[in-house]
């Protein structure tokens, strides 16, 4: 009976040992704070039936965006949690967007990340559309140089390519792509 209990205790502790790694898959510390900044570009297209309403010709607000982001990730072994802020200059029907969101995800490969996000976004519209704020949800992936075969060229730099898509109150489609610099 003692051997059975000992074997069960050892097997039960194996997943915990896997989470208590000294380093993450990309070689960075498994626990700490990872600040980052980035520049993204994309497009924000709103539904016709959103709280923004429509102008007389039955159009919907939409426009290209250039976005600056800044945030921190807290690595927790193979997963991470973080917070991110953004400020975006819009074109066409969107003047400015800005917001803050929480992120949670997993490390993927040598230097990549897969994440989900949720937070609050403010949208300042133009061309007759009102300004609004609401919840924003999204998913994305960051791909590091080692994952695309550039490890020898870039060494251990913190540059990652990011692709993400978000939705504003499930009424919009907001694909974005850009470069993120981790420190």
Where are these predicted regions, by residue range?
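Gram-negative outer-membrane beta-barrel domains
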Residues: 19-183
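Gram-negative bacterial Sec-dependent N-terminal signal peptides
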Residues: 1-21
């Amino acid at each position: 009976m003692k051997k059975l209990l000992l074997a069960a205790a050892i097997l039960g502790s194996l997943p915990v040992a896997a989470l208590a790694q000294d380093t993450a898959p990309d070689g960075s510390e498994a626990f700490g704070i990872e600040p980052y900044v980035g520049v993204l570009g994309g497009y924000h297209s709103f539904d016709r039936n959103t709280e923004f309403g429509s102008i007389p010709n039955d159009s919907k607000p939409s426009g290209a965006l250039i976005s600056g982001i800044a945030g921190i990730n807290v690595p927790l072994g193979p997963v991470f949690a973080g917070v991110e802020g953004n400020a975006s200059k819009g074109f066409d029907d969107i003047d400015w967007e800005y917001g803050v969101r929480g992120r949670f995800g997993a490390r993927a490969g040598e230097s990549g990340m897969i994440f989900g996000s949720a937070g609050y976004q403010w949208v300042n519209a133009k061309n007759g559309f009102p300004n609004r704020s609401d919840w924003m949800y999204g998913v994305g992936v960051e791909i590091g140089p080692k994952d695309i075969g550039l490890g020898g060229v870039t060494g251990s730099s913190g540059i990652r390519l990011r692709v993400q898509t978000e939705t504003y109150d499930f009424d919009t489609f907001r694909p974005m792509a850009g470069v993120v610099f981790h420190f």
